[in-house]
Design a protein with these regions (language model features):
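Thioredoxin-like thiol-disulfide oxidoreductase module
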Residues: 35-53, 79-90
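Non-catalytic interaction surface on structured domains
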Residues: 26-27, 47, 73
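Structural micro-motif
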Residues: 50-59, 69
Length: 96
């Protein structure tokens, strides 16, 4: 079982590229939603992230974890890998 990771992106977004590169470097599969030209996807992103309107917005097992800076902070603090492992094991993801 793997964690379900979703990322909302837009075209020409350096932060999006950076977040996807981090996930890819860890071998984490993710579903990408390009919301740049899709107003419905953008509304969905904002609603799911509880108001997050910047790109990217990242979700692990449906829980919002923030954007590129937040996911890199989690990695730098040594909290990203355990978070992904918990999600893969089916345990509740705690992002705070």
């Amino acid at each position: 079982m793997t964690a379900r990771v979703e990322i909302y992106t837009r075209d020409y977004c350096g932060y999006c590229t950076r977040a996807k590169a981090l996930l890819s470097s860890k071998g984490v599969p993710f579903t990408e939603y390009d919301a740049s030209m899709d107003p419905d996807k953008r509304r969905e992103m904002i609603q799911r992230s509880r108001g997050g309107a910047t790109y990217p917005q990242i979700f692990i097992n449906g829980r919002p974890v923030g954007g590129s800076d937040e996911i890199h902070d989690l990695d730098r603090e040594g909290r990203l890998d355990p978070l992904l492992a918990e999600a893969a094991a089916g345990r509740k993801v705690r992002t705070t």
